[in-house]
Design a protein with these regions (language model features):
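Short, solvent-exposed loop/turn segments at secondary-structure junctions
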Residues: 12, 38-39, 85-87, 138-141, ...
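A short acidic (Asp/Glu
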Residues: 16-19, 42-43, 90-93, 143-148, ...
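Active-site-proximal specificity loops/subdomain of glycosyltransferases
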Residues: 33-77, 82, 87-103
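Structural alpha-beta junctions
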Residues: 24-32, 44-49, 123-131, 191-194, ...
Length: 247
């Protein structure tokens, strides 16, 4: 079974959506990743990884640096990194040519569903062609296969840290804020470390619906996003293209 469940969070002491959806059977594996100035505010009965004081909201790259700390912590582990605002969902298996198992096209995961999802991803990480994996995004139209390989993934990702431990220090982890996960994942894929994305299990981000404020993203500017995306495009022009005229 997976070793650690990392949930980086900031300024959401009373809005721990993802944490509230973790099954009781897995709570002992949860590690909340928090900035040092607000550690005392969190009273949840879980493990904590307190970031160095210099990694805080005043740092443009605080999210990237937080994830770097997590990746280094997970060098020899099977672990996942989950945004703190996730609702886990399950699609109707009718989409994949199987008998319908629910009234609608999807529903929120039960605790049993979530345990099944964790077990599935844990097994995938033992396969030689899968170094990272996870669920798809609910807003994307699902494929008709149960999973896709070497495709887009974000917000909710499982890793086998041992697979790429030997190259971790060579990967770009703190070059950009916007799309930092895209840059990291493309760097893994381009080095032969494959992924797998479930179409059966998926997730929704509550922040994207405007239901939860985000101190990390709410002050985003076009200039910052453009600059960071240009960095990614320059590194991986064959996979990442900005289809927008700057003028």
């Amino acid at each position: 079974m997976i070793d650690r469940i990392f949930i980086p969070t900031v300024n959401r002491v009373n809005d721990q959506t993802t944490l509230s959806n973790i099954p009781k059977s897995l709570m002992d594996k949860v590690t909340l990743v928090v900035q040092s100035w607000e550690r005392r505010k969190y009273k949840y009965d879980v493990d904590y990884l307190v970031l160095p004081k210099n990694i805080n909201l005043d740092d443009y790259l605080c999210l990237s640096k937080s994830r770097k700390v997590i990746y280094e912590e997970g060098r020899n582990l099977k672990y996942c990194v989950l945004d703190d605002d996730l609702i886990f969902k399950r699609r109707n298996q009718k989409r994949f040519g199987l008998p319908s198992d629910m009234e609608k096209s999807s529903r929120n995961c039960t605790e049993k569903d979530t345990e099944e999802m964790f077990n599935l991803f844990d097994k995938w990480l033992d396969e030689k062609d899968v170094s990272f994996c996870g669920p798809s995004q609910i807003q994307n139209i699902p494929q008709t296969k149960l999973y896709s390989s070497n495709s887009s993934i974000s917000s909710c990702v499982w890793f086998n840290g041992k697979n790429f431990n030997h190259i971790l220090d060579d990967l770009p982890m703190v070059e950009v804020k916007y799309g930092e996960d895209v840059l990291f994942f493309l760097s893994l894929l381009s080095r032969g470390f494959g992924n797998r994305v479930s179409q059966l299990f998926c997730f929704g981000n509550e922040s994207l619906k405007g239901k939860i404020t985000s101190d990390v993203w709410d002050n985003s500017t076009f200039k910052d996003v453009w600059r960071d995306h240009k960095i990614i495009e320059k590194r991986f022009p064959q996979f990442f293209q900005i289809l927008l005229d700057e003028k």
